[in-house]
Amino acid sequence: MEISTTQISIILLIALIPAFFSLKLGKELYK
């Protein structure tokens, strides 16, 4: 099975977007 760069970038986006939002929410909560 061949992994293309587009698949890698999609996986990274899917992984990073929730982490980014949880960081933003955490900063808002701990003000």
Curated annotation (Swiss-Prot):
Transmembrane segment boundaries: 7-26
BP term (GO), one: photosynthesis
Membrane topology: Single-pass membrane protein
Keyword Chloroplast assigned: yes
Any Gene Ontology CC annotation: chloroplast thylakoid membrane
Compartments (UniProt record): Plastid, Chloroplast thylakoid membrane
Pfam families named among the record's database cross-references: PsaM
InterPro entries recorded: PSI_PsaM, PSI_PsaM_sf
Source domain of life: Eukaryota
Primary location group: plastid
Keyword Thylakoid: yes
Keywords: Chloroplast, Membrane, Photosynthesis, Photosystem I, Plastid, Thylakoid, Transmembrane, Transmembrane helix
UniProt family annotation: Belongs to the PsaM family.
NCBIfam families noted in UniProt: PS_I_psaM
Protein name, UniProt field: Photosystem I reaction center subunit XII
The organism of origin for this protein: Euglena myxocylindracea
Source taxonomy: Eukaryota, Discoba, Euglenozoa, Euglenida, Spirocuta
